[in-house]
Amino acid sequence: MYGQMLIFKTASGKLSEVEKVADQAFAAMKGIKGFKGVTYFGDPDNNEYGSFYLWETKEDLDAVMKEIMPKMQEVTNALAIEPPLRRIYEIYEPKP
């Protein structure tokens, strides 16, 4: 499994816009092959927000990065006041 993390900082008072983008992103991702889930998080006091998407395989993640992410990055970049932090991680799941 693979995870994609995005963290960005906005100007003050952008929480409702960030939530709208999160809702749109989830709606776009939920039916895509390999999508396992997403967690959105934020710190409104410091205007910092982020997401962590889970994908079944690296190939699934790569396919999404080519097709959907350019538009999502455009939207995120419009909200961000500094370059967003983007990372991809291989996920380790402990064995029982």
What are these regions (language model features)?
Residues 1-49, 56-67, 79-96:
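Short S/T/G/P-rich N-terminal loop/turn motif that feeds into the first structured element of a domain
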